[in-house]
Structures are given as structure tokens and as C-alpha cells.
A protein has these predicted regions:
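Soluble "head" domains of membrane/secretory-pathway proteins
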Residues: 1-212
């Protein structure tokens, strides 16, 4: 069952929100914040390679990083910059630690940001990846765009690209920085070898979380 009271129940602003790709809602007062290792129920945020809301498309994954954390995997084990206790399913991570590189299925091997020449990461070794927090300021360049382009487009409604000299453009206009307006979470499945999760599609906006 899902406890919607932990974070506070999510209330839609109007009935149209339930049928829209844009979520308009607010929360009642909750009992506590999300904690690392909580299992979260949330609306799957990756639709057509962008963050968009689908009311009946719901995932259950474990939270391994909160807003303001940096998350990585080292030899198959999750590491969090602000939390030094075990994260996730240790037995599954033990298996990932031991499996040979050539046995990692190519379709699950590589993780965001999918730029292997720059970041030769895979599900056993990746990161650190910073999880955005509301109010954080990020300087924009080609590197940060690799990690946060979906968030930038979600928060601004603009299309982001880079010019030939590496300048970041928003709807064709130069932009130097961005202030995040939402909190985000990094979630993973306990079946680390076979889980569609934040390692592949990125961050979960707080507003998309249904409960714990």
C-alpha cells in the first residue's frame, strides 16, 4: 500500500490536470520529508524523452539521493555524498560487483548522460551526478546541458542547444545560468541488473511523487 500522508496528499488544482502532460497540484501538510532508502511511488517522468506527466503511469523505486546529494556507483555499489550507510539492495549490488564486463547486456550497460566518449560510465561505475535542489544556481555549458537539459526544458518551456562555440542557447538566445525551481530525486530499482530507473532516464520531480 502507498502512504500518501508522509509527504502530504497531492491535490490537483483542477480536473484537467489529470488528463494533461503538465501537472498542476499542491500538497497537504505531510508528516516528514522523503528519506534515503524510502521506496517511492511516483508518476513516471520520462515521456518522449522529456519530463511530462502521465497520471496512470506509475513506478515504484527506491530513493538513493535527495535534492542536493551527489550519487555515484563504485564497483556496483551506490555511494551518496551526504549519506554513508548502505543504499538499496546490497545482495543485488554484490552480484553486479562480481559479474564480468562482457556479461553486462549492452542494452542495460550504459547510463546517463549517454556520452560515452566524455563519460565512459556504466551501471557498475558512474558518477558522481548532482541531484538538483530548488534554489540552486547552475552555470550552463555543454557539459551541464548533457545532464540537465530535460530539467531545463521542463522548468522553462524552452528548447536548449549549443552554438558552434559552445555557448548554451535557450530558444536561440544565449543563456549563462539557471536557477532550479523544483526539487528532484534519484531513484533506482532493487533489481539493479534489470530495472528501468534514474540511471537511464534521470531525475524525478518532487511534484511527481505520489507517496512512500
Amino acid at each position: 500500500w502507498v502512504n500518501k500522508l508522509v509527504m502530504g496528499a497531492r491535490i490537483y488544482d483542477n480536473l484537467d490536470s489529470a488528463n494533461s502532460s503538465t501537472l498542476c497540484s499542491w500538497r497537504t501538510r505531510g508528516m516528514r520529508r522523503v528519506e534515503r532508502n524510502d521506496i517511492l511511488i511516483f508518476n513516471y517522468p520520462n515521456n518522449d524523452n522529456r519530463i511530462a506527466f502521465k497520471i496512470n503511469y506509475v513506478y515504484a523505486k527506491r530513493c538513493v539521493a535527495l535534492p542536493g546529494d551527489s550519487i555515484s556507483a563504485i564497483d556496483g555499489y551506490y555511494k551518496n555524498s551526504n549519506y554513508h550507510e548502505p543504499l538499496g539492495n546490497k545482495r543485488a549490488q554484490d552480484y553486479l560487483n562480481q559479474v564480468s564486463e562482457d556479461r553486462l547486456d549492452e542494452c542495460i550497460k550504459y547510463t546517463i548522460p549517454y556520452s560515452y566518449d566524455t563519460y565512459p560510465w556504466n551501471i557498475r561505475n558512474f558518477g558522481p551526478i548532482y541531484v538538483p535542489r530548488k534554489g540552486d544556481v547552475i552555470l550552463l555549458d555543454a557539459e551541464t546541458l548533457l545532464f540537465y537539459s530535460k530539467i531545463l526544458e521542463f522548468e522553462t518551456g524552452k528548447t536548449f542547444s549549443t552554438s558552434s562555440d559552445g555557448t548554451v542557447l535557450a530558444d536561440g538566445e544565449p543563456i549563462e545560468y539557471h536557477i532550479f525551481t523544483h526539487d528532484y530525486y534519484f531513484t533506482v530499482g532493487d533489481n539493479v541488473m534489470n530495472s528501468c530507473d534514474s540511471r537511464y532516464w534521470g531525475f524525478v520531480p518532487e511534484e511527481y511523487i505520489v507517496g512512500v
